[in-house]
């Protein structure tokens, strides 16, 4: 009594976030602590009971079991923690935060406590997983976060999925060595659009400086040089809103990933095109500005109207109206990495795009 402690400060953070409309991804305990034996099954039950009773009435909690760990390590501890929380708190969503380049569905897709799947596509560029044999996808596909979304959505029971940890803006490629170069705004845009257009229900954005709340007097990690409040001005951070604006301009719950919308070559690595659609609209993300053949018959409408939408600044430009089945589109700016655009197609009678103007 009279002492402002750890859990008092946790309460303050959660309530401060709630006042600002922010949800907290509540990582109960970091995976490394469980792996090293810092919490057993009985302790997980007691801890889960404490957490659930303390926060079950907070409106802005999303429970995250695990903490950057493979789900086959101390599985009994994770199941006990999750089931205990769920037995008390039946209102909040729950998922599992897996290790890099893995997916929660590998271990918990049948678990009654799992509400949605999460994958960590991680921070490595193509070719950096040389000796990693525990990842879900083969070497050479490290940046293809869309593959995790597709893999998850092929599982049964079908659960929503999200990339919980893609490459962060301004963090080293490969995470640890600044000499490898840093991920930039065009990279974090690509991860966001690839994942969402491949079927993820949302996206996680990260920034190296914001992650560490880097401020004067604190030693930086991962080669960070920018203070966290200065990083709020970085382009990738401010461009995430344009993806949300785009997706919510169209009927959300009928949207599916559909790569058959691409009549030509879907492409590999940075040339990969990713399409998503509803009944009468289609969105295609093109990271390199290359020509692409699109099957307009995949959506309803006698004629289709087309626009280019810029993920960099949300600018919208009208292309024209089409009645043919397959049409070739190429945005301005040339064929190069980071010249990314979204092709919007709608039934010619629909007014969805007005929300973007």
Go through the PLM ranges and name each one.
Residues 1-128, 133-135, 139, 143-144:
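Active-site mouth of glycoside hydrolases
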Residues 14, 52, 82, 148-153, ...:
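Short amphipathic alpha-helical segments and helix-helix/interface helices
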Residues 41-51, 180-183, 222-227:
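Short, electropositive alpha-helical surface patch
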Residues 51-54, 84, 104-108, 150-152, ...:
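Short, flexible, glycine/charge-rich loop motifs used to bind or transfer phosphoryl groups or to couple energy/partner
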Residues 111-126, 130-214:
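Catalytic-core region of carbohydrate-active enzymes that cleave or remodel glycosidic bonds
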Residues 157-161, 168-172, 184-320, 332-357:
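Aromatic- and carboxylate-lined catalytic core of secreted/periplasmic carbohydrate-active enzymes
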Residues 327-329:
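Short strand-edge motifs at loop-to-beta-strand transitions and within beta-strands
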């Amino acid at each position: 009594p009279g002492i402002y402690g750890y859990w008092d400060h946790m309460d303050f953070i959660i309530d401060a976030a709630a006042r600002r409309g922010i949800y907290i991804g509540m990582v109960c305990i970091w995976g490394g602590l469980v792996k090293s034996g810092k919490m057993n099954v009985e302790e997980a039950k007691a801890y889960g009971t404490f957490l659930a009773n303390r926060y079950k009435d907070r409106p802005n909690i999303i429970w995250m079991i695990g903490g950057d760990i493979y789900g086959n390590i101390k599985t009994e501890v994770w199941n006990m923690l999750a089931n205990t929380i769920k037995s008390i708190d039946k209102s909040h969503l729950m998922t599992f935060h897996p290790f890099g380049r893995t997916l929660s569905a590998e271990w918990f897709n049948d678990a009654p406590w799992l509400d949605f799947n999460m994958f960590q596509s991680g921070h490595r560029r193509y070719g950096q997983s040389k000796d990693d044999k525990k990842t879900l996808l083969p070497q050479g596909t490290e940046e293809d976060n869309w593959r995790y979304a597709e893999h998850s959505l092929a599982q049964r029971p079908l659960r929503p999925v999200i990339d919980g940890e893609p490459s962060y803006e301004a963090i080293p490629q490969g995470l640890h060595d600044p000499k490898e170069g840093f991920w930039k705004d065009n990279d974090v845009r690509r991860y966001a659009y690839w994942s969402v257009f491949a079927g993820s229900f949302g996206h996680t954005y990260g920034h190296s400086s914001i992650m560490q709340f880097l401020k004067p007097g604190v030693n930086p990690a991962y080669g960070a040089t920018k203070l966290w409040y200065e990083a709020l001005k970085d382009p990738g951070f401010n461009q995430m809103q344009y993806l949300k604006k785009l997706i919510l301009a169209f009927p959300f719950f009928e949207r599916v990933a559909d790569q058959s919308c691409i009549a030509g070559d879907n492409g590999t690595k940075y040339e990969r095109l990713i399409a998503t659609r509803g009944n009468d609209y289609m969105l295609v993300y093109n990271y390199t500005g290359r020509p692409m053949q699109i099957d307009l018959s995949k959506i309803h409408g006698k004629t289709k109207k087309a626009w280019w939408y810029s993920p960099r600044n949300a600018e919208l430009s009208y292309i024209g109206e089409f009645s043919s089945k397959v049409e070739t589109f190429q945005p301005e700016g040339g064929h190069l990495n980071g010249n990314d655009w979204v092709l919007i197609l709608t039934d010619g009678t629909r007014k969805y795009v007005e929300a973007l103007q």
